[in-house]
Amino acid sequence: MAKRIVEPFRIKMVEKIRVPSREEREAALKEAGYNPFLLPSSAVYIDLLTDSGTNAMSDHQWAAMITGDEAYAGSRNYYDLKDKAKELFNYDYIIPAHQGRGAENILFPVLLKYKQKEGKAKNPVFISNFHFDTTAAHVELNGCKAINIVTEKAFDSETYDDWKGDFDIKKLKENIAQHGADNIVAIVSTVTCNSAGGQPVSMSNLKEVYEIAKQHGIFVVMDSARFCENAYFIKARDPKYKNATIKEVIFDMYKYADALTMSAKKDPLLNIGGLVAIRDNEEIFTLARQRCVPMEGFVTYGGLAGRDMAAMVQGLEEGTEEEYLHYRIGQVKYLGDRLREAGIPIQYPTGGHAVFVDCKKLVPQIPGDQFPAQAVINALYLESGVRAVEIGSFLLGRDPATGEQKHADMEFMRLTIARRVYTNDHMDYIADALIGLKEKFATLKGLEFEYEPPVLRHFTARLKPIE
C-alpha cells in the first residue's frame, strides 16, 4: 500500500496557486500549440514539467546568499565551492557555469579537441548509458554521434530491478570494438539515468565501465545532475554500503570518472547554476577555462553571481542529508505506488526524481511517431491543470544524418517532482486526476507537427491533434 513520508521541514513562505478553469485550460493549450513547454506558468496548477531549477531553497541557502562576494575575479564563494567539490568528489579543478548545458558546452568541445590533437576522433562518438536531450544535443552540435547503451532491463517497465540505469557492459565492449577506442571522445555515466526513468546506476557498474574505459584510454565524464539520489539508492540497495554515509558513497562514486558536469538546478537544490569539475588533468582544465571566458564568463564565476555560488555550496551540503533524501525518494515512490495500485503502468520501481508513466501500454493505439505520451500529457492537463513532460519519440527527435525519426524504446510521461515544493496532498491530487482519466485513454488520438524546430524540437515545437 502507498505510504506517505512526512516532510522533514516546516514551511516559512508560501506561493498562491490556482486551478485554471476548464475553458482557460483548453484555450491555453491550443494557444501553446498543444506543447506544454509553451504554456505560461499562470495557466498551470501543479507543475511537473521538470525538477530543474524548480526547487525550494532553504532558510540557510537564502542566508548564504547574503554573504555573496560579487567580485568579478577571485570571489570568495568560488573558493568555498572549490573546497566543497574537493570534499565531495576529490577533484582538483572546478569551473562554475550558469547551468548544466553551460557546463557541457565548456567541456565537450574541449574533449573533442583534446582527442583530435592526438590525431584521433576522425569519426567522433560519445557513449552513455543514456544521454539526456540537452546532453545529446551538445554531442551532436559538435559533430559527434551520441550512442545510448542502457541495460535491457530498463525497457521492461513492469519487472523490478535495482539497477535499471546500468550500462549494458556487453554493448559497451561491442561499441568500443565497432567504432574504435580512438574515435570515442568520452563515456558519459548519467546518474541517475533520467531517460530510463530516473533509475540508479550501481557502484559495481560504474567501476566496471571505468575500468574498461581506462583499458582503452577513454575519458569518463559523470553527468551529475542527480548524484545524491543515485548515492541514496546505492546505500539503500547495495549491502556493501549499508553502513556508509551518503558522502562516503559519493566519494566512492567519483573514483570512477575523470570529470563531471552538473546541473546544480537539481540535487544541489538551486534555481540556477552548474559546474564542471576535473579530477587531475591540468591540460583539459586549462583548455576548459579558456573556453569558459567567452562562453560563460570569467573563470571564477562562470555566469553566476557570488550569491548563487554561496547557495550552491550550502545546497551541496543539504542535498547529501540522508533524512532529506529518504523523504525525497519516498514522496516520488508514494505517487508511483498510488498509480500502480490503480493499474496505471509505470517504470517500476520508481526512480529518484519522477514517476514515469508507460504510455506505450496506456495508449497502445497511438504509434510512436504520433507521440503517445504527449497525447496523455495534454489529456492530464485538460483534466486537472497538471503539466507533465514527454520522454520518448517527441524528445528524441530525428537522426541528424538521415532526418528520420529516432526510435524510442519507451514512450514515457514524466511526472517530475520539484524538491521541497509540493506536499503529499498534491501527490494525491495528481494521482486522482490521472486515475480519473482511465476510461478516456482508449479514445485518445495522436499529434502531428505544425512547426518542427531542427534542434531540441520539443521545447518550441507546435503540434495539432490528428483528426
Curated annotation (Swiss-Prot):
Pathway: Amino-acid degradation; L-tryptophan degradation via pyruvate pathway; indole and pyruvate from L-tryptophan: step 1/1
SUPFAM superfamilies: PLP-dependent transferases
GO molecular function: tryptophanase activity
Annotated EC: 4.1.99.1
Top-level enzyme category: lyase
Keyword annotations from UniProtKB, A to Z: Lyase, Pyridoxal phosphate, Tryptophan catabolism
One Pfam family per UniProt: Beta_elim_lyase
Obligatory cofactor(s): pyridoxal 5'-phosphate
Stored InterPro entries: ArAA_b-elim_lyase/Thr_aldolase, Beta-eliminating_lyase, PyrdxlP-dep_Trfase, PyrdxlP-dep_Trfase_major, PyrdxlP-dep_Trfase_small, TNase, Tryptophanase_CS
Keyword Transcription tagged: no
Domain of life: Bacteria
PROSITE patterns in the cross-refs: BETA_ELIM_LYASE
Catalytic activity: L-tryptophan + H2O = indole + pyruvate + NH4(+)
Residues with N6-(pyridoxal phosphate)lysine modification: 266
NCBIfam families assigned to the protein according to its UniProt record, in alphabetical order: PRK13238.1 (NF009709)
PANTHER family from the UniProt entry: BETA-ELIMINATING LYASE-LIKE PROTEIN-RELATED, TRYPTOPHANASE
Quaternary organization: Homotetramer.
Family affiliation: Belongs to the beta-eliminating lyase family.
Protein name in the entry: Tryptophanase
Gene that encodes it: tnaA
